[in-house]
Amino acid sequence: YNNNNKNNNNNDDGNINYQNTNEFKDNKKNMNFKNQYNNNYKFDENMNNSNTMHSRNSNVEEHLRNNSIDMNNSNINNYTNQQTRFSSFMENENENENKNYHTGGMNNNIHFKNKYDNNNSSMKNTDNNKTDTSYNMKGTINNDNNNMDYLRNINNINEYKGSAKNKFYTNYMNKNNLKFTQNNNDNMNINEDNNNNNNNNNNNNGVFSNYQNNNMNRNNSINIKRNLNNNNNINNNMNKMGSQDKNQNSNNNFYMNYNYQNRKNSMNNNMNNNMNNNMNHNMNNNMNHNMNNNMNHNMNNNMNHNMNNNMNNINSLDSDMSPNYHAHVKMSMMNYNNNESNTANPNQMNFEQTNNDNMKRENNNMNNYGYDDNTVHVNNNTPSTDFFSRAVGYNNNYLNNNNNMNSAVNNNSSNGNNMKNENSENKNVADNNDSLNNNKNNNNNINMNESINNNNTLNNNNEYNNQNNNEDEDDDDWGELGEDKYIDINSIMKKKNVILNQLEADLNDLSKKGNDGKNKKKNKMKKDDLFVLPHTN
C-alpha cells in the first residue's frame, strides 16, 4: 500500500482513509519490540488520530470508555475520527522473522477467531496489509493463550454489506443482472406490442378481402413466432443470471440466494404469462378468425361433418385456459355449421399447420427446460394443474382440430377435382354436340345446294309430276322432303374432310409464302448493311 492508493472500491461503505495507517507502517523501524508480549510502545507524534490506542495491551472496551466518542451516533460514511486503529509488529520466536499482522477490514461480517502459533504467524481469511478494526467490534486480548478473540456485533452491520470481495461481486452481479433484466423488459414490451398488433388484426378480420385477411393472419403468426423467440431470450438471460449466482463464492449467501429465488419465480411468471398469451392468441386467431375468413363461405357437407367433431374436441378443453374462450368459440362454431360453402383455403391451412408444428416444438422445449440442478420436469413430478402440462394438452387438441380441418380440405380438394373432371367431360360432350350440329347445318346447306344444282335441268314434266304428287304427301313415309331428300351423313363427313384438307393445304401454302417473303426481306437488309459507310468525324 502507498499513499496514492486509498483502496477506494466505490462500495456503499464510503471512502476509507488509510493514510494514518500507512504513516504508522512507514515508521515501524522505530518500534523495537523484542517479542509479542513487550509493553514498550513508541508512538509517532505525527499520527494525528486521537482515537488510536497507545498501548498494544490495552483493552478495546476500556479504550472506548476512555475516549468519549459516541460511535452509534456518528456518521457511518466518515470514519476518519471514529475508527479504532492499531497495528502490531511482532517477532516470531522460532523463525526470528518479523511479521506484520492486523485484525481485518472494516465492516467485515465474517465470524472469525484468529490464533497465532509457531507455524502460522499471519491471519487467515483477511488481507495481509490492512490494519483496521471496525468500530462496532468488541474484544479482548488474552496474552496467556496467545490469541485474540473478537465477537461480531451484527446490529450495526447491514446485510447488504460484506467484505470487499463480496461487495465487488455483488456490484458486478447487480450490473449484469440489470442488463439482463432490461433486456427481458424489452422482450416483454415487444411481446405486448406483438399481441396488441394481433388483436388489431383480429378485430379487422372479415372487413377486408380474403387476400388482406390472409396477410394479417400471416403477420399474426410472425408476431407469435417472435414472442416465442423472445421467450427463449428471456430463458437465456435467466440462465446466465442463475449461473452467475451458482458460481459465486460469496459469504453473503442469504442475500444472493434470496434474489436468485426471486428471479426464478419471476422467470416462471414471465414464461407462464407469455405462453398463455401465445397459446390464446394462436388458438383464437387460427381457429376462429382464419376459419371465419376461409371457411365461412367455403364449407361443404364434409366440412360440416368435421366441424361437428371439432365441437366435441372443444368441449374437452380445460376451462382454465381462457375465461371468454368457450362461449366465443362455441357460438362461432355453431354459426359456421349453419353456413353453406364449398372449399377451404389449402395454402392458408398449410401455413397454419406450420405454426402448429412450431408450437409443438416449443412445448417440447419447455418440457425439457431446467432452471437449476433440481429441475422439475413436466413428465416427472409436476402437478397436473401445472401450466405446461395444460399447454401440451391444449396444443394436442388444437392439432387434432386442425388435422380434421386439413382432412376436410383434402376431401374438398378431391371433390373439387372430381367436379372438374365431370365438368371437363360435360364440356367435351357439349363441344361434340356443337360440332355435330354445325356439321348438320353444313350438310343441309351442301345437300340443298346440290339439290338446287341438280334441279336446274328440270323440265315441265317434272313440275307436272310434282304437282300430281302433292295430293299424296300426307302418306309419304319419308316425310315432307321425300325419299330423294334424305340426308346421308357418311357422304357429308367425307365431303367435310375433303374441304378441311383443302383449307389446311391453302393455309400451309400461305404460311410458306409469308415465310419466304420474310426471309427475302431479311436477306435484303443484310445485303444493304454491307454498303453502310462507317461514321467519321
Curated annotation (Swiss-Prot):
Bias (Low complexity): 336-347, 399-469
Keyword Flavoprotein found: no
Ranges of Basic and acidic residues composition bias in the record: 509-518
Segments of skewed composition (Acidic residues): 470-479
Keywords assigned by UniProt, alphabetized: Malaria
Region feature Disordered, mapped onto this chain: 1-22, 187-254, 336-372, 399-479, 509-528
Statement: the UniProt record of this protein carries the keyword Transport: no
Protein name (database record): Asparagine-rich protein
Species annotation: Plasmodium falciparum
Source lineage: Eukaryota, Sar, Alveolata, Apicomplexa, Aconoidasida
